[in-house]
């Protein structure tokens, strides 16, 4: 029988020998930033030569700006602030490709979570959401991998011509660069997932590997598709985490603590650092 808890005593956690789990989750945060910076360096390099240090600063600056925008849409504009202004249009194309790689990864793992959820808790609404997610994933994949093929069909449309410049720039990316961006997005997603499972373990949430992975996949997908602002996202994260994980544990305080901890580690801390870098950049200019 699973041990059911409704509250967590922080002192007990630190005294129980579980503190290394928290340390490991914290250590993985710089790895997250490093992976995303490496991806940005590869993709942004098509528009302008980018050093790894500059890529790290761009990623942190993007996180800082994303925290005050709906569904973090300000992340990529924030990154462009660190790049040369004359390359802005090219970098917008880079941002578009990076965003598509991120969404392709998100929906791929999200569908795995949805398949698991439908198998465990079948229902009409869950099935409809799964089908819709598969359709959206297919569209994203076609745009990501076959842009050059299908874009020709829309060249005659006046509204599409306004985006022709971005389209031509997107064609400059090689298949290898696209796959590298996609692979790094997937690796970063798995690191996020590992952090969450580590924090849940720290909070004594009993989960099997399959339960933990699939539910975490679904959690990250859900918070990405639900409209929100990062500053107000914490409440949504809490509600989604309780809805998904209450099926495996009654430790509501532990679930919420792990969710809040992940939010602080991967968003708040990098956003603070990024804000300092942005302020410093403005002062230097």
Summary of predicted features, one role per range:
Residues 85-136:
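Hydrophobic alpha-helical segments and helix pairs
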Residues 65-67, 218-236:
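Transmembrane alpha-helix interface/packing and boundary motifs in multi-pass membrane proteins
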Residues 75-84, 229-246:
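Re-entrant/interfacial helical elements at transmembrane boundaries that shape
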Residues 1-59, 116-226, 257, 264-285:
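Predominantly cytoplasmic-facing regulatory/coupling regions of multi-pass membrane proteins
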Residues 56-85:
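Extended non-transmembrane interhelical loops and adjacent amphipathic helices
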Residues 64-70, 92-111, 222, 260-272:
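Membrane-embedded alpha-helical segments of transport systems
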Residues 36, 40, 70, 74, ...:
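Alpha-helical transmembrane segments and their lipid-water interface positions
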Residues 53-55, 72, 86-100, 249-261:
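Membrane-interface alpha-helices at helix entry/exit sites of multi-pass transporters
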């Amino acid at each position: 029988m699973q041990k059911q808890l409704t509250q967590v005593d922080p002192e007990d956690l630190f005294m129980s020998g579980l503190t290394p789990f928290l340390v490991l989750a914290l250590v993985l945060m710089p790895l997250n930033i490093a992976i995303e910076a490496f991806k940005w360096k590869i993709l942004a390099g098509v528009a302008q030569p980018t050093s790894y240090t500059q890529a790290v600063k761009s990623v942190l600056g993007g996180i800082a700006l994303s925290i005050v925008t709906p569904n973090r849409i300000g992340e990529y504009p924030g990154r462009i602030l660190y790049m040369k202004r004359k390359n802005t249009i090219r970098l917008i194309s880079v941002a578009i490709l990076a965003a598509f790689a991120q969404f392709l990864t998100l929906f791929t793992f999200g569908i795995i979570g949805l398949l698991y959820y439908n198998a465990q808790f079948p229902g009409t609404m869950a099935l409809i959401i799964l089908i819709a997610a598969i359709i959206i994933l297919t569209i994203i994949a076609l745009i990501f991998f076959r842009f050059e093929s299908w874009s020709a069909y829309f060249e005659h449309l006046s509204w599409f011509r306004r985006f022709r410049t971005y389209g031509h720039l997107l064609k400059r990316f090689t298949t290898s660069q696209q796959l590298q961006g996609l692979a790094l997005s997937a690796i970063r997603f798995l690191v996020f997932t590992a952090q969450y499972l580590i924090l849940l373990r720290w909070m004594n949430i009993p989960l099997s590997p399959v339960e933990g992975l699939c539910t975490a996949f679904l959690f990250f997908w859900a918070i990405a598709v639900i409209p929100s602002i990062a500053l107000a996202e914490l409440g949504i994260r809490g509600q989604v985490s309780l809805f998904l994980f209450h099926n495996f544990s009654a430790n509501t305080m532990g679930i919420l603590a792990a969710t809040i901890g992940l939010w602080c580690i991967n968003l708040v801390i990098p956003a603070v650092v990024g804000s300092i870098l942005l302020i410093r950049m403005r002062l230097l200019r």
